């Protein structure tokens, strides 16, 4: 009987552990796919950093004439703090703050303020792929990497990087059976080039 009890206990731990880790890998994969979707949406949506579209005009000066290469900048928008920071005050003086509506568009999808209510594939947001994602989990970086030019009518053409933060996985079975602690889902970052930083078609 002792042997049977030991074998049953070990089998239970192995089976329950396998279920937990399969769930972990599923959520990891879903989070990575959600980041890909977020980067694609960010490339064709209003920037989370308000005023970013005006930087190509704001940098024009005696030292940066129209048509010159855009000075480098990196703007980081953190959904947890609902703020954007820039590493180049001279270039980023036109930035005004953090646009919650723009962040919600990336997280929830166009025309939505919640998850799992996308009306079509064109309106899917990050949390439609992975419902645990909230704006507080998302970090978006806009970095000037050589494209575009000063005074460009369409604004700058930064490289956009989307990543997740503070997204723990809570073991269900192993937490109770063996005291496993929460595990941070591995970070995933996807970068793409901005195409048209506007959520609406231009009017002529």
Please place each PLM-identified region on the residue numbering.
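A general structural-boundary detector
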Residues: 18, 22-25, 93, 177
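N-terminal single-pass transmembrane signal-anchor helix
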Residues: 1-23
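Homeobox/homeodomain signature
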Residues: 11-16, 31-33, 128-130, 180
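Membrane-proximal amphipathic alpha-helices
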Residues: 20-32, 47-48
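Short, conserved structural patches
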Residues: 36-204
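A broad detector of short, well-ordered amphipathic alpha-helices
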Residues: 3, 7, 29-37
């Amino acid at each position: 009987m002792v042997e049977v009890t030991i074998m049953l206990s070990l089998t239970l731990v192995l089976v329950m552990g396998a279920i937990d880790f399969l769930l972990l890998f599923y959520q990891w994969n879903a989070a990575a796919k959600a980041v890909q979707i977020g980067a694609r949406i960010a490339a064709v949506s209003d920037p989370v950093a308000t005023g970013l579209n005006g930087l190509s005009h704001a940098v024009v000066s005696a030292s940066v004439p129209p048509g010159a290469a855009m000075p480098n900048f990196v703007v980081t928008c953190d959904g947890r703090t609902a703020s954007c920071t820039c590493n180049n005050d001279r270039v980023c003086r036109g930035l005004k703050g953090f646009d919650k509506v723009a962040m919600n568009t990336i997280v929830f999808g166009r025309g939505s303020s919640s998850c799992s209510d996308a009306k079509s594939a064109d309106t899917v947001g990050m949390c439609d792929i992975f419902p645990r994602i909230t704006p507080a989990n998302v970090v978006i970086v806009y970095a000037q990497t050589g494209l575009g030019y000063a005074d460009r009518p369409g604004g700058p053409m930064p490289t956009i990087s989307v990543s997740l933060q503070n997204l723990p996985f809570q073991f269900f079975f192993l937490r109770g059976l063996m005291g496993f602690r929460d595990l941070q889902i591995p970070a995933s970052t996807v970068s793409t080039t901005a195409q048209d930083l506007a959520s609406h078609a231009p009017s002529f």
